[in-house]
């Protein structure tokens, strides 16, 4: 895992709500040092859904539905209840229910589950089949935060079916065949503390080469990556990754503005495989933040939690994500530690001494590691 070392931007000001909520939820979040969430974007079904939160009321708009749906979120702590605002009203689309759940958990990040009363039996059945809601002893269905965040359709447009398992041998390493490289928009997520939408898209060499070349020649990037050079060198670099079935390149953006380059890879076929007991679906990643204005704690938290989430969503069989930052890259190791990555060991690669770190799927989802940790 490589990333440019220098962090030059102070913590960004969180998104400020435009209205003043009057509910007890506002006081609870203010006491915890978080801004009250009055608006939210959810991408259920690959489409943007705007959610307005006013006290105990939620309004969901967007997607294929022509009208908004209205919900109430009552209770507090572990006793939250989400239900349609009007009994007997036309059932809300399933995507609206997912968007309402997404917003409810974002507004109450301390909550691991809540009671849910969908108006549509078919929507309830779909949520139950996906594991988003589970029957409780009292006969009430409970929506679970950790299983909701494992639903690819909330963050990945056009989710392909999982790749059937068949094995191959590459340079003496026996591993599953990998799915074709993804293209286009790969992941989208609203970041509440920035008030902006984070996205991953596939890198397009002709479009992104000048930007990639500029980033690689930035002194703060070059000190870590050591890949300075001209356009020809960097085209060859990207074409090499495009030919490698175990890696793919991505561009990260905030509200459509590109700021970082990522490489995602399967570790079983990678250079770190000989240094630990690699499992068939372990993933790893590299990053460089090319735009100086996007370096800093608030941005690092956004992209670090998002790359982990994206890789876990790509395949439910991925149980671990690995990293190998330089041993002297203390800031990045601290960031990884705060994001749930555990130190495994130190080891030597040809170009660096590295710290092997690992994030477990259960730890990420159960402990809600998509939110900032202090």
Question: Model features per residue range: what roles?
Answer:
Residues 92-106, 296-312, 334, 338:
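Conserved acetyl-CoA-binding loop-helix of GNAT-fold acetyltransferases
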Residues 81-95, 285-297:
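A short, internal acetyl-CoA/4′-phosphopantetheine-binding micro-motif in the GNAT/acyltransferase core
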């Amino acid at each position: 895992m490589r990333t440019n070392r220098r962090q030059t931007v102070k913590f960004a000001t969180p998104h400020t709500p435009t209205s003043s909520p009057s509910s007890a939820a506002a006081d609870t979040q203010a006491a915890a040092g978080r801004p009250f969430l009055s608006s939210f974007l959810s991408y259920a079904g690959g489409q943007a859904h705007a959610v307005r939160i006013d006290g105990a009321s939620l309004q969901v708009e967007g997607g294929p539905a022509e009208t908004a749906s209205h919900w109430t979120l009552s209770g507090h702590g572990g006793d939250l209840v989400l239900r349609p605002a009007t009994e007997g009203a036309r059932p809300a689309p399933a995507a609206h229910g997912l968007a309402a759940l997404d917003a409810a958990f974002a507004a109450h990040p301390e909550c691991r589950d809540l009671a849910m009363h969908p108006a549509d039996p078919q929507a309830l059945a779909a949520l139950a089949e996906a594991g988003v809601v589970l029957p409780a002893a009292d006969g009430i269905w409970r929506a679970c935060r950790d299983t909701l965040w494992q639903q690819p359709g909330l963050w990945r447009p056009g989710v392909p079916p999982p790749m059937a398992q068949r094995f191959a041998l590459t340079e003496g390493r026996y591993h599953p065949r990998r799915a074709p490289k993804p293209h286009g928009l790969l992941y989208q997520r609203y970041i509440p503390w920035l008030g902006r939408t984070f996205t991953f898209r596939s890198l397009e060499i002709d479009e992104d080469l000048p930007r990639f070349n500029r980033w690689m020649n930035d002194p703060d990037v070059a000190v870590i990556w050591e890949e300075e050079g001209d356009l020809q060198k960097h085209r060859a670099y990207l074409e090499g990754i495009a030919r490698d079935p175990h890696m793919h390149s991505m561009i990260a953006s905030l509200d459509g503005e590109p700021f970082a380059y990522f490489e995602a890879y399967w570790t079983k076929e990678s250079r770190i495989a000989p240094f630990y007991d690699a499992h068939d679906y372990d993933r790893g990643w590299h990053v460089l933040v090319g735009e100086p204005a996007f370096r800093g704690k608030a941005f690092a938290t956004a992209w670090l939690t998002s790359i982990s989430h994206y890789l876990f969503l790509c395949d439910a069989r991925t149980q671990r994500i690995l990293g190998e930052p330089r041993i002297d890259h203390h800031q990045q190791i601290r960031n990884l530690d705060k994001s749930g990555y555990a130190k495994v060991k130190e080891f030597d690669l040809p170009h660096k001494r590295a710290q092997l770190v690992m994030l477990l799927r259960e730890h990420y989802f159960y402990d809600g590691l998509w939110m900032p940790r202090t």
